[in-house]
Each structure stands twice: as C-alpha cells, then as structure tokens.
Regions:
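Feature of multi-pass inner-membrane transport and sensor proteins
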Residues: 181, 218-226, 257-292, 323-324, ...
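Short helix-to-coil transition segments within interhelical loops
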Residues: 80, 164-165, 170-191, 378, ...
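Membrane-water interface segments at the C-terminal ends of transmembrane alpha-helices
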Residues: 1-28, 43-162, 190-211, 215-217, ...
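Short, membrane-interfacial amphipathic segments enriched in basic
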Residues: 28-37, 325-330, 334
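Short helix-adjacent coil turns
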Residues: 47, 238-240, 344, 518-519
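Short cytosolic juxtamembrane segments of multi-pass membrane proteins
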Residues: 168, 270-282, 451, 460, ...
C-alpha cells in the first residue's frame, strides 16, 4: 500500500509546503528573494488586532446562533410530537445542497437596505425613515451565517438526540418535571458532547466562511481574515502573494485550535453514553397546547431555505429588479430563462461546472474507496499514515486551499494547468479527499472480511478483490461520495475564486460576476435552475445516506 500513501502525499502535502514557503519568501528589489518574517510583520501592521477581533466575534456569534436554532429544532423533532418533522428533515438536506452564494444573494434581496422586500414593507407599514434592518453589518453577517449553518447543526445533533433512552425523561416526568424542564435538565445535558462538538464545528465553519463576509461584510465595511486574504490578491495592480500566504498560515493555526478541541471532545463522548444493550421503546414527549407554537419554531429551517429561493424565483421573471411590487405581475416574462441558455459566459460556466464536478467526483470516489478500504483493513503504520495524510485538508479553509494551490502552480510552471479546469479538479480532489475516505470507510466496514480473504485464497490480487468484491458491495457509499463531491464542487466559491480565470469559471463564479455587474434578473434565473438541480442531487444523497446509514 506504499503507492497509495505516496500518491496521497504527493497530492496533499505540496500545496501546503508551497504556502509556508511563499509566506516566508521576501522579495528584495535588485537582490532576488530571501527568507524572513516580513510578510507576517506587514500583515500585523495592516490588520492589527481589529481584524482578528471582528473575525472571532463573527465566528462565535454565528456558531452560537446556529447551535441554538439547530439543536433546539433537533431536540423538538427527535424527542417530541411536534408536527412537520419530515418537512424539517427534507428542508435541512435541501439546504445543504443549495449553493451558499444563491442563498446569500437571496437574503440580500430580502433584507437589503435599498430594495430589500422586508425593509420596504417596514417603511411602508410603519412609516420608518432610513433603514429599519441594517443587513450590511457585523450583526447582519452573524444572522445570515448562523441561519446558513443551522441545517447542518440540526442534522449533526439529531442522531444523538434520537438514540437516547426515553426512560430518563419518563423518570423526570414521574418526579413532577414538565416537558420544558425535562428537556433542559435531562435531555440537553446528556447531549452535551454532541452539542459541544457541533458548536466547535460551527465555529470552524464560521472562521472559514468566505461567501457571507464577501457579499455582506465588504459592502458594510466589515472585513474578516478570509476577505482580507482575498483582497490582498485581487486589490491593487500586483497581487501580494506573500502577504496572502501569511494570512492563510495564520488562519490555519486559528482553525487548528478548535479542530483539535473537537477531536478531544469526540474521544470523550463515551462518558455520556445512554444507549446500552438493554432494549427500549422510542417515545415522544407530548407538547400539549405548545405543539403548534413549537411547530413554528422548527419551521425555521425550511423557511430559511424557502424565503431566499422564493425571492430569487420572483426576480427571475422580471425584466429588471427594483424591489417587489404589485405592478410586477404585469411585467413578468420568461426572457431571463431564455437568456441564460443564450449567453456564452453562462453556458461556459455550466459546462465547466459539469466537467469539474464530474472529474473531481470520480477521482475522490476512486481514491476514497482505496484509502477507506486500506484504513479499514490494514493495521499499524500504514493505516495511521494514510488516515493522517488524507485528513490534513480538513485543517485548511477553502480560501486557504485556493491560495496554496495558486502559489504552487505559479511556481511549477512546467505543469501547465493554471487557468484551466484541471487546476479546479485538482483543488477539489484535495479538499474533498477526507470526506471521500470517510464515506467509503463506513461502507467498507459493513463488508465481512471473509469475502475478501476467500478471494485472496483463490489467487485474486489486490485490484481484482477491489473491483470484484469491495466495489460492488460498497457501491452505495461510493455513489454517495460521488454525489456529495459533485454537489459541493459545482457550488463552491471559496476555493474556485482564486483559481478561476476567463476560461475556467464555474457556475458560482458566473453568479458572482452577474451580481457584481448588477444583472439580478438573469442571476436569479440561473440561481433557480442551479437550485433545482442541486435539489435533485440533494434528494438522491439523502435517500442513499438514509437507506445505508452512511452519515451516522
């Protein structure tokens, strides 16, 4: 299995080594370059502590909001008889599939200061002057990021809450505790490791967030580390790759701290086990008269997906967008949908997305199966080494991975993939390798090893066993991996934005360009089509993971 370890190392390690090298490389006019900490000093001088304070405040606020909404919804769905449970579950999965940039722009159309639907209604109904809801602010960023991560927090918390023995809550009820007290004093404390783990993952996600700070933070003059990194490359006549790499290295360190704490928390989760060998009958707490008020709370997840998509759908039928009004019904047209299929830049973005999504999904599924099989079956050093190498990209935010691969292939000019779809495929293979390995590892664990041993005893070689035994039996995990990678590769912005050029832009880049150019109706039409396609993939992924329990 040495070839597998070598191949994984050759793909994963060089981008990060080049990133560190670039951050320490200081150009001297007329003297070439030398090694030093000048880039870090320059970053500290420009940004100071304010940038990090804003970034941390944004991350903490968004993660707390996401866990509050997601965990409380999961608690109600898993432990009570609240209505619309299936609607919430489906809405959470579809929200995962919908591109962040689509939802982010949708929320701007809803809550924007000038033509936002909600602000316009508040001004009209209550006679408010100015801007009732200031979206382009740190508070607006926290609100939108928290809403965007709520479905993930819900899905991650739900399994732990669903598996709890209801006898503990029944004992609390017999002691006179009403259902709110039982949930707060019994259920949630037992789920503490899961809640803390989800909080840490939410914190990591918010630290890495790029789309929300780009769309909402920059117009409001609020900058985080990710947008500072982006502007270091894209502002000015000469990209400052050294300073951008310094930002990236510091962000990796910031992400690594909560990630290491997350692994520690999950290792200690056995202390809070409530599922034992003793059988129990799942039971739900009767909410009584609070049943339907609680239903409004759990509908936060499907509504947070439907609201931005509905305003996008509305805008897609208008010749120009200036805020919804009754007069819009007379102006509705399908011209924007026809224009989507007539524009060369949009068609090129769709084609590139399909190529990048297919290429990266096939590569990750194949590599993930081999690595997952090796980690599941091998022992000692090889298992540990492949697991560590394949998991390294988890530490690197998307924007960091983008700058790392950018500086790598700017230096390796003899590999001419910069500015092509191949550099995007390479980037997404690196980014999603940990997820592919873990999905396929779960699938391989369900296969009895005797089947493989029998094939080896019959004279079959490694690749024969992989092709004839492991692949057919682990095919649900492989297909789920393929769908997951394809679905995320075509929607990603943070990795692609630094690696895309005139010839290799994908759909997310096209949507951002349309937004920057003020072409809202055509942007909305494209976003609706992308959301429909993402929904189909999301439903397929949900069916596979639910049927074969690949996410649990």
């Amino acid at each position: 299995m040495w070839f597998l370890l070598f191949a994984a190392s050759a793909v994963v390690l060089p981008p990060f080594l080049y990133l560190v090298k670039t951050s320490l490389t200081v150009p001297r006019p007329g003297q070439g370059t030398e090694i030093g900490l000048d880039n870090y000093a320059r970053v500290a001088e420009i940004a100071g502590w304010d940038l990090w304070v804003v970034t941390v405040a944004f991350a903490i606020g968004a993660s707390l909001l996401a866990v509050l909404l997601g965990a409380s919804t999961a608690c109600l769905v898993a432990r009570t008889n609240v209505p619309f449970r299936q609607v919430v579950f489906v809405g959470a999965f579809l929200s995962l599939a919908t591109p962040v940039i689509v939802k982010g722009i949708g929320w701007i159309l809803l809550l924007g200061p000038n033509n936002g639907l909600v602000n316009n209604l508040l001004r009209e109904w209550f006679g408010i002057d100015g801007t009732p809801i200031e979206l382009f602010s740190l508070g607006g960023m926290i609100f939108i990021e928290g809403l965007l991560f709520t479905p993930i927090a819900f899905l991650l918390t739900l399994p732990a809450l669903s598996a709890m023995d209801p006898a503990l809550e029944e004992a609390a009820a017999m002691a006179g505790a009403r259902w709110p007290r039982a949930l707060l004093r019994v259920t949630l404390p037992l789920a503490r490791p899961s809640l803390l783990a989800v909080l840490l993952l939410s914190l990591i996600r918010a630290l890495e967030s790029f789309e929300v700070p780009l769309l909402i933070g920059i117009p409001g003059g609020v900058q985080t580390v990710t947008t500072a990194l982006y502007q270091t490359v894209h502002s000015g006549f000469i990209p400052r790759y050294g300073e951008a790499s310094a930002y990236a290295v510091l962000l990796v360190i910031a992400v690594a701290l909560p990630l290491s704490w997350y692994y520690r928390v999950t290792r200690e989760a056995a202390k809070f086990a409530t599922v034992t060998g003793k059988g129990f009958r799942p039971a739900r707490i009767d909410l009584g008269p609070w049943k339907y008020p609680c239903a409004l709370w759990v509908l936060t997840i499907p509504v947070s997906l439907a609201a931005p998509l509905l305003i996008m759908l509305w805008a897609s039928f208008l010749p120009f967008y200036s805020g919804p009004s009754p007069e819009d019904f007379a102006r509705m047209t399908l011209a924007n949908y026809r224009a989507v299929w007539a524009r060369d830049d949009i068609l090129a973005g769709i084609t590139n997305s399909l190529l990048v999504g297919t290429g990266s999904a096939c590569a990750v599924a194949a590599a993930g199966l081999m690595m997952g099989w090796t980690v599941a079956r091998r022992r000692e050093f090889m298992r540990w080494a492949i697991d560590v190498v394949a998991s390294l990209p988890l530490v690197f935010p998307g924007i960091v991975l983008g700058i790392a691969i950018l500086v790598q292939f700017l230096d390796l000019r003899f590999i001419p993939i910069y500015g092509t779809v191949w550099i995007l495929i390479f980037a997404f293979v690196v980014q999603f390798m940990p997820y592919g390995m873990r999905f396929c590892h779960s699938g391989v664990l369900s296969i009895n090893r005797d089947l493989e041993d029998g094939a080896y005893m019959s004279g079959a070689r490694y690749f024969t066993v992989l092709r004839r035994i492991v692949l057919p039996l682990a095919s649900p995990a492989v297909v789920a991996t393929w769908i997951y990678v394809f679905m995320h590769a075509i929607r990603d912005l943070s990795v692609a934005i630094l690696l895309s050029g005139p010839g290799n832009g994908i759909v997310s880049i096209v949507i951002l360009d349309l937004w920057n150019n003020g072409e809202v109706p055509q942007l909305a039409a494209l976003s609706v089509l992308v959301a429909v396609g993402a929904a189909v993939l999301g439903i397929a992924f949900m069916k596979l993971t639910a049927t074969h329990r690949l996410y649990g």
